[in-house]
Amino acid sequence: MDRQSLRTTLRAMDASNENGSAKGAKKTTIGSFVRWTFGFNSVPLTTLVTITTVLLGLLVYVSTSVNPPDVTEAQKPLLNYAWAQLGEISRYPHPYFSHDNDRVRQHILKEVYTLAGREHFEGAQIEVDDSQTDIFIQKEDVFDKSAPPGKLTYFEGNNVVVRLSSKNSDKSLGAILLSAHFDSVPSSFGVTDDGAGIATMLAVLKHALAQNEGPKRDIIFNFNNNEEFGLLGAEAFMHHPWAQNVSAFINLEGTGAGGKAILFRASDYGVASHYSAAEMPFASSVYQEGFSNGFIHSQTDYKVYTEGGLRGLDIAFYKPRALYHTRRDNIAETTKNALNHMLVNTIDVTQSMTEADSFDHADQPAVFSDIGGYLFIILPLQYIFVISCLTLAVGPIFVGFLFLLVLRKQINAGTSETILGGWLRSIVSVLVSVVATYFVVETLHLGNELYVVRSFYTPLFAGLGTFIFVNYVLLGFFHFVRPVCDQKLIILLELSVVLWVLLLLSVIHEATHKATGEYHFLILYIVVATASILGLFGHLVTSTETSTFVEGPEDEEDTVDASEATETSPLLPEASPDNAAPSIHGAVDPENQQEDKTLQKIAVSMGYDWSIQFLLVVPITFFVTFGLAASLLDGLHQTPLESEKSADFVYTTITAMSVLVGITFLPFVHKLQVFVPIVVVGVAVTASFVHILSPPFSSNAPAKMRFVQNINLDEGTSYANVLGRQDVLQEVLEYIPSTDTFKPNCSSRGDGVEICNYIAPRPWLIDGEKVSSDGDFAGLPTNLLDVKVVPVNETSSGPFDRFDGRFKISALNNRGCVLRFNTTRFKSGDVETGVSPVKMVTLRHNRVGKTGITTGSGSRFSMFGWTRDPKTGKDEFRSFMHGVDDVTLHKLDWEDPEYDIQLSWIPRWYEVGDPEDEGNEALKNRLGVTVTCSWAEYLDPSSIVDEQGRRRTMDKIPAFTELNNFSPAWSIWSNQGRGLVEVSKYVEL
C-alpha cells in the first residue's frame, strides 16, 4: 500500500463515519484521542517538557541552594552550644599577627578543660598539648606555583592539640584527626573561615564525651593557628608526635560566608565512603578536579595533610565567595542552620570513621556526589574507568549492529526513505546554534562583564534560550521542508557519536590525571545510547511501511499525521488475534484487507515508544547537565573579580554549559508547540536585558578589593595601596575623602587588574604614641621598626668564597617579618634573575635551649638543611642548590621585639660560566636586604598623646577605616598582604 492509497483509505473511513457508521466513528474517535494524547505530537511532548523542566529545575535549585535544612529539636542543645562558641570566637578579627588571636586560643583552652572536667563516659582520657612548636622549612609557595622555589619560613606555632581516648580505644587502629584553624585574616571576623570549624570541633568533643561509651579509635582535635598565610598550623602539627598515629582526618574549612558545608575533596574511596553516614549529604568531586587542574587557586590544610601521607576529607562552606575574607564574614551574615549542617554531618562521619576496623582502597580516588541533599553516591574511580571502557567498546558495537539491521530491512523493502537520510540537518542546526549561543554570551560578556559576579543565571538562561530557539527554528524548518524517516532517532544517534568521543577523552583524562569530575559523560552516553537502541529496536519490530512512512507538512491536518507515524514507530506492536506481529521483512496486508485492520495497523504505527525515550533522556540528562552547570558556576562565577582571564573562563564555561544543557531537548525540539520557544526566547531576551542594564554589583554580591598600607622608612613615604579590577577600583575611590586631597596614582597590573596608591595618614599601632606637630599626615612611625647591622668576622674575599652578614630587627608589637634580597644581578621574587646567592640563614634566639619539637628520623617530612644547636639556641638552614629567595619570620612573644639573623651568601654562585663584569668588585659582593614587617590589628582604637600631653583615641589604621566607612554598599575590602600595614627598611651587608 503506497502513501496515496493509504490516505484514500483513511478518507474513505472518515466518509463512512460521516454517513453514520457507529462502529467506525467509535474506532476513529478513540484512535484520534489516543494519538492526540499519547502520540509523538506537540501536545503531550510540550506537556512533558514543561513538567520535567520545572520539577528538575526545582530539584537542582534545592540541591545547590545555600539554605541548609531546618534544625530539629534533638539537634538544638548541641547547636546552641556551638553557636555560643562561634559568637565568642568571632567577636573581633583574630589573625596570627594580633593579640585577639591569643584571646581566641585561651578561650579554646578554657573550653577544652571545662568539657574535660564535666561528667563524661567511664574511662575517658583527655590529653591536652598546648606547647610551642617551632619549624624551619623551605617549600614552594602554597598559593603561587610560579613563585621561586627558595622560600624559607621560620614559624613558631601554638596549636591546641587534644586527644580523646577511652578504655575501649584500640591504639593499633590509629586515630581520627579533626582539624580547623582558629586564626582569621586581618580584614575578617572569621565566622565561616574558620570559626565555624572550631565551634564544630568543640561541639564534637562535647558530644563524644556525653556518649555512653568511648570511641573505638582515639580522636585527635587539632585547633591550629596560622592557616591563612602558608598553612603553617598544619605544618606544625605534622611534626607533632601524635601525627604519627593518625589514620584519617576530617578538615573543616570555609571559603564563603554561610550556606551549606560541602565535601569537595577526598584522598581516596576508603575514607570518602564514610561520608555516606552524613545525615544531610552535600558533596561533589567536581570541585576536587577543579583544585587539581588549578581552576581554584586557594588552598586548605588538606594539602599539607595529604602531602604528609595522611588520608582524609575536606569539608567547607564555599559561597558566596565575594564575602570571603571580608568584614561581612561575621555572625550576622551566617545562620544557625548553616552551622548545624557542618556540625551534624561532622558528628556522623566522625562516628563512622571511629568505628571502622580499617580503611581500604587507599590507592583508589573517589567519584562522589549527592542527590538532592538526601542521597550520597560514591564509587571508586577505577570502577568508573572500567565501566567507561566497557561502554566505549560495547556501545558502538550494539548500536552499529542494530543500525545495520534496520538499514538492511529498509533497503530490502525498497523504501524511498531510509535511516541514512537527514543526518546533515542536525549537524548544521547545532553548529549554527552554537555560534549563535557564543555570540549572545560574548555580547553579554562585553556589555557587562562583571554582572556575572552578581548572577550567572542571566547569561546561562540567555545562552540556553538561544540554543534551544535556534534549533527549534532550523530543525522545524527542515522537518517542514523535507521530513525524514525518524528525525528524533537520527539526532539521538548523532548525539551518541559525539558523547562517545567525549567519553573517550574523559577516560584518557581519568587514566592520566585521575580526574574525578568527568563521570557525567558516562551517564550521558549510556542514557542517549540506550534511547537510540530503543528507537532502532522499534524500527525492527514494526512493518517497514509503518516504520518508514514519511508525511509532508501538507498532511498535518489529516486524520492521521503520517509524519508522526514515522517519528514514533512502536517499541512493541499491539498483539491481537487479527493482527499478528509483522515479519522482519515488513510484509503488509493485502489491498483487500478489512478497513478496521488497516486502522488498527495505523494506530499501532502511532506507537508510544517516544515517551520511553523522552523519560529516559530528558529527566536524567537535564538533571545531570543543569546540576553540573549550577555546581561549576556556583564555585566560579565570582572569580572574575580576581582577573580578566577568570572572567573569560567563566563566560566560556557558561557557553559550554548552555550547549550541554540544551542538547537535552535536541531530539524533541522540532515537535514542541510554538508557545514554548516563544517563552524560551522571551526568557533569553529578558535575561539579556537584565544582564546588560543592571549594575554589576550589589550588597549581596559586592566588588571585592584589597588594601595594604606601605610605609617606607628609608624614603619617608606612607601610601595606601589598593588593588582591584580596572575602572571599578577608581569608581570606588571617588567616594573616599582622602582621594580628593591626595589624587590616586593608578597603574595596570595586567589581566584587567590595577593598583592605585595615594598618600595615607600614618597608623597608630602602639598605645601611647605621640602625635606629630605637623598633624596626622606628617611624621612616620619610625619607632615601629629598626634594623641594625652587627659586625661579624671578615671572611675571604675570593670570587667563590662565602660572605657572612648579621643584623638585628627590632619590631614593636609584632609577630611577623619578611626578608627579601638583592644584588647586582639577583632580586627576590624575580625568577629571571636566577638562583639566589643566599645559601644559609641562621636565627639566634634570646632564650637558650628554646623549647620546640624538632624533626627526627620518624618525621613525615624530611627537613633537609635544618639544624638546631640546643646549647646556643640557634636555628640554621642551608640551601645550596636552590638558594634562599626570601625568608618569612614569625614569633609568638610580644615582649621580645628582636629577630637576630645571620646570612651567608656566595656572590658569584650564579655567575659560573658568565664573563666577569667590569665595575666595583666590592659592590658586587654586597647583599641588599629589605626587611618588611606586618601589623594586622585595626578595629580597636589606640590611645595616643597629643601636643598638649592629653590622651586621645585614634583609629589604628585610619586609611582602612576610611575605606570601610565611605565605600559604597556594593563594594567591600579585604587584606592584600599578611597584615594591613607593612613597614619596610633597607640595609646592605
UniProtKB/Swiss-Prot annotation:
Residues 1-25, 548-576 are annotated as: Disordered. It is found in: Vacuole membrane. It comes from the Eukaryota. The record marks 324 as: Transition state stabilizer. It is a multi-pass membrane protein. Its cofactor is Zn(2+). One of its GO terms (biological process) is proteolysis. The active site is at residue 227. This is Vacuolar membrane protease. It comes from Yarrowia lipolytica (strain CLIB 122 / E 150) (Yeast).
